[in-house]
Amino acid sequence: MKIGAMNNPRLEIGEALALFAASGFDYIDLTLEYPKAHIDVIDKKAVLAAIKASGLGVVGHTTYYLPFASPINSIRQAAIEDVIKTLGFFKEVGARTVTVHPDSGVGTIEPKTSVSLNALSFKIISDEAAKHDLTVVVENMPGIFSNVEPLNTLLTTVPALRFHLDVGHAVLRGNKFKQLLGMFKEKLVHVHFSDNRTREDDHMPIGAGNINWTEIVQALKGIGYDATITLEVFSNDPRYLVASR
């Protein structure tokens, strides 16, 4: 099992790489987001060199608020393109998976339509990712995609997709962790850990909230999970992240 951490997109990627390498993490969960880490604003050569110098592995992560379920085709296509233009770089830095985030859509659109539009978007992205030997991974999100049924529709409609289990999301407003793990254990390739009080996605240090981490870890061990776990702990004080490791 490998333990990693995610860069804060408000900071330069190099700062995260230095901290994670010095703190004994195995990889960076590299999110390419604004304001300082989007593919359009980073110095790709410098980031590539810094990753190589750090010795860290890379897991790919994309902007979490892209409108993949927009009923407006041009907006949906822009969201798709925003992910596609990251794929070559993710391949170059050694990533094998790239996380995308399903969009619950807008209230005037039926949930089943939002699910279908996400599936359409992810099929296009997945096909492009395959050209770079990358696997697209879908993360459970607050909203309609906190539930098994819509996620299952995505993963069966686009068979190449794999599952990313965010534990912090899974316990919000009704604990669905066991349900999600049981349903998607065969497709599970990536996990996020962060603590909360089960009301908001707080991204607290492990042990600071209400999540039963003994139960979580035992359940993952019980299915033989041995891949990547990212500590998605957000704080201005990096000691909280390091203490969670």
Name every feature range the model reports, one short phrase each.
Residues 1-2, 9-24, 55, 145-165, ...:
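Histidine-acidic metal/acid-base catalytic patches
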Residues 11-14, 50-56, 69-162:
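Active-site acidic/histidine proton-transfer and metal-coordination neighborhood
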Residues 23-33, 59-66, 101-102:
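Short, conserved active-site loops that position catalytic residues or coordinate cofactors/metal ions
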Residues 29, 59-60, 99, 137, ...:
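Conserved beta-strand positions in the central sheet of alpha/beta enzyme cores
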Residues 29-52, 102-110, 201:
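Glycine-rich, proline-tolerant flexible connector loops at the mouths of alpha/beta enzymes
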Residues 36-38, 65-68, 105-107, 142-145, ...:
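Short, small-residue-enriched loops and turns at beta-alpha junctions
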Residues 39-42, 70-75, 109-114, 175-176, ...:
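Short, solvent-exposed loop/turn segments at secondary-structure boundaries
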Residues 42-55, 120-128, 179-183, 215-220:
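Catalytic-core regions built around general acid/base machinery
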